[in-house]
């Protein structure tokens, strides 16, 4: 750079430095103009009012408020599944339908590639409509990656590695609080047992979920599919008319625990007979389990089951004596009102000429068949209610998970 350029540059800088001074001086000339107009005088006052905004120290407390930063509120419900059998796979389907994020599946007896096949194809509920594959060591369902483990014991499953999810215990093995607590030790936040439990708090959606206590209940049972069908029906009848006593029979589809042909059965000999060939009388704790969710019915209900040669959908027959006399039409109206109101999505009502296969894939816990029921008189009635013992029950498991999560927040 030449000396001349430097001089010019210095001159320019000097000129720039001098400019701000005149800029500050010109404001006074507009002031006289403002004085010429009497109206602008009130303007300075609003300007002063604008200066008052210093009270915005109030906004800082807003960001400082810790409640929104409490973390758990925005946290997303994540689910882990232990046991990829009938219920485990249908729980995954229900989660995908309801937008619940599944982060891991554990089953020591099923290879990951075979998991894809078993989840994709189902003889009862049909082929999965979305995409499913095994990619990069993970089960990928609808582009959603799910970690796969093959641990034999709950305490070995690395639930912490997948964010400590809510776990569905669907092996049918770890049914007690002590046995299921190993999931908690391994990092699970909550455990829902998809079967009756001898000692875990039992919940049936639509009946007693409000009794859930986040502070003391980290392991709970979703009861059985039959209890989920019977309890909503019994609740409506008992609250409206009163149940003096009752007997329940479930005509139940065969399950994986039965034999395709005659075989050994240590617990009950009849259970070992061919499931496809026989109607098999069997025991069930479903009726007595209702008293866990409706304590007022303790000592008033019991029941039994008939296992029949159908793959899915079962039906409950509740025969009971009413405390308050009522015509069958009044009973129908009470159930219809509950199905449209507080028990919508749990209890349903139909007057169609239906049969069992009409309910395959029905997500309700209990579908009251108004035309199938009968009454001997106004005090003694037989009530019939259908349920998809696989699909409907799996949806209730997911609903219970969501409810617990909402309360835990």
Curated annotation (Swiss-Prot):
Q: Where is this region: Disordered?
A: 18-76
Q: Where is this site: Activates thiol group during catalysis?
A: 252
Q: Which GO terms describe its biological process?
A: glucose metabolic process; glycolytic process
- Regions of biased composition (Pro residues) lie at 53-71
Q: Which SUPFAM superfamilies match?
A: Glyceraldehyde-3-phosphate dehydrogenase-like, C-terminal domain, NAD(P)-binding Rossmann-fold domains
Its localization reads:
Cytoplasm
Q: State the Pfam families in the record.
A: Gp_dh_C, Gp_dh_N
| Active-site residues, record numbering mapped to chain | 225 (nucleophile)
| Residues holding NAD(+) | 86-87, 107, 152, 174, 194, 389
Tell me which UniProt keywords the record has, alphabetically. Answer: Cytoplasm, Glycolysis, NAD, Oxidoreductase
* Enzyme class label: oxidoreductase
What's the catalysed reaction? D-glyceraldehyde 3-phosphate + phosphate + NAD(+) = (2R)-3-phospho-glyceroyl phosphate + NADH + H(+)
Disulfide bonds, which pairs? none
Domain commentary: The testis-specific N-terminal extension mediates tight association with the cytoskeletal fibrous sheath of the spermatozoa flagellum, possibly via interchain disulfide-bonding of Cys-21 with sheath components.
Please give the function described in this protein's UniProt entry.
Answer: May play an important role in regulating the switch between different pathways for energy production during spermiogenesis and in the spermatozoon. Required for sperm motility and male fertility.
Subunit details for this protein? Homotetramer.
Which NCBIfam families does this entry report, sorted A to Z?
A: GAPDH-I
Protein name as it appears in the record: Glyceraldehyde-3-phosphate dehydrogenase, testis-specific
The gene for this chain is GAPDHS
């Amino acid at each position: 750079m030449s000396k001349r350029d430097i001089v010019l540059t210095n001159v320019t800088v000097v000129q720039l430095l001098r400019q701000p001074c005149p800029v500050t001086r010109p404001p006074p000339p507009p002031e006289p103009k403002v004085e010429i107009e009497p109206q602008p005088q009130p303007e300075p006052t609003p300007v002063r009012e604008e200066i008052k905004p210093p009270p915005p120290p109030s906004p800082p407390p807003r960001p400082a408020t810790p409640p929104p930063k409490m973390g758990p509120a925005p946290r997303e419900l994540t689910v882990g599944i232990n046991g990829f059998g009938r219920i485990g796979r249908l729980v995954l389907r229900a989660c995908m339908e309801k937008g619940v994020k599944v982060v891991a599946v554990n089953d020591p007896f099923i290879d990951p590639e075979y998991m894809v096949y078993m989840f994709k194809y189902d003889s009862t509920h049909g082929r999965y409509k979305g995409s499913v594959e095994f990619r990069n060591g993970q089960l990928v369902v609808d582009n959603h990656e799910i970690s796969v483990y093959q641990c034999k014991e709950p305490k070995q499953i690395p639930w912490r590695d997948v964010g400590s999810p809510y776990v569905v215990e669907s092996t049918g093995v770890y049914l007690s609080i002590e046995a299921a607590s190993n999931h908690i030790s391994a990092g699970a936040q909550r455990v829902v047992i998809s079967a009756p439990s001898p000692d875990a708090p039992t919940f049936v959606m639509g009946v007693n979920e409000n009794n859930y206590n986040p502070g003391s209940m980290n392991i709970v049972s979703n009861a059985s599919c039959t209890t989920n069908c019977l309890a909503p029906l019994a609740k409506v009848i008992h609250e409206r008319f009163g149940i003096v006593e009752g007997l329940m029979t479930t005509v139940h589809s065969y399950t994986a625990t039965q034999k395709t042909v005659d075989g050994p059965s240590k617990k009950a000999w009849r259970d070992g007979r061919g499931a496809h060939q026989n109607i098999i009388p069997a025991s069930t704790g479903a009726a007595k389990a209702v008293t866990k969710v409706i304590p007022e019915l303790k000592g008033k209900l019991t029941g039994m089951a008939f296992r029949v040669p159908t793959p899915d959908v079962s039906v409950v027959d509740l025969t009971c004596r009413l405390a308050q006399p009522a015509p069958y039409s009044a009973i129908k109206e009470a159930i219809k009102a509950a199905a449209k109101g507080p028990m919508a999505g749990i209890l349903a009502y139909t007057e169609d000429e239906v049969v069992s296969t009409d309910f395959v894939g029905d997500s309700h816990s209990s579908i009251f068949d108004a035309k199938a029921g009968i009454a001997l008189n106004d005090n003694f009635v037989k009530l019939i209610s259908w349920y998809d013992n696989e699909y409907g029950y799996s949806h209730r498991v997911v609903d219970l998970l969501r409810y617990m999560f909402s309360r835990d927040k």
